[in-house]
Each structure stands twice: as C-alpha cells, then as structure tokens.
Regions:
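N-terminal TM1-TM2 helical hairpin plus the immediately adjacent luminal interfacial "cap"
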Residues: 11-119
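Cytosolic juxtamembrane amphipathic/interface segments immediately preceding
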Residues: 1-10
Length: 119
C-alpha cells in the first residue's frame, strides 16, 4: 500500500488528473456497454465525422479524447501518459502541459475529420 501511495505522490498533478479522468470514464462506460463497439462509443462521445460535420456536435472533438476502445487501448495510452506526461508537465508546467494535451487532442481529431471528408 505504501508503494502505491508513494507512486501517486510522485506524479504530476495535472497529468495524474487526466489519467484518473480517462480511467474513470472507461470504467463508467464499461458498466453500461461494450467499449469496443463503435456504435456504443459513438453514442457516448466518440469522434464520428457525420455527427461533427452534419450535426455540428463539435464537442465530440474534446469528449473523444477521454474515450478508449477496449482495455488494451486504455492500458497502452495510460502507461505512456503516466510516464511521458509527467516528464512533460514537470518540464513545461501544468498550464502549458494541459494546453499541449488538449491542443494536440483537438488538432488530431480535426485532422482525422478532415481526412475522412477528403477521402
């Protein structure tokens, strides 16, 4: 138990908060359906181009940043985020780290939407 407490205390606050939100969202969605089912995930905030472009649901560009299609997707992303995010937050500070996290996520989702429209 002490190892877990020490590990959590050594984490950067903003990054740890992002990780906790990602895991919490995954656990909540897992209680209600299959996180590997595209229809279920689209109904719960995944980035889906027709919803964004035709229906104007631009908030999906943000909500989708916290969704993971299955446990392995969540696990791999969180392992990288825990270690790389801590380094980045300690180097840049909380505000700049969060700007990069959200800016990168939104930009990536916009690029994905653009590529779907273009093809």
């Amino acid at each position: 138990m002490d190892e877990i407490r020490d590990f959590l205390r050594s984490r950067s606050v903003a990054n740890l908060t992002v990780v906790i939100i990602n895991v919490a969202v995954f656990l909540i969605l897992s209680c209600f359906g299959d996180t590997e089912n595209a229809d279920f995930m689209a109904a719960h905030g995944a980035s889906y181009t027709p919803y964004i472009v035709q229906d104007g649901k631009y908030y999906l560009l943000i909500t989708s940043m916290f969704l993971h299609f299955g446990l392995s997707h969540l696990f791999n992303n969180m392992v990288v985020l825990i270690f790389m995010g801590d380094i980045l937050e300690k180097k840049l500070g909380k505000i700049r780290y969060l700007l990069i996290y959200f800016g990168g996520g939104i930009a990536g989702n916009c690029l994905s939407v653009y590529m779907v429209i273009k093809v």
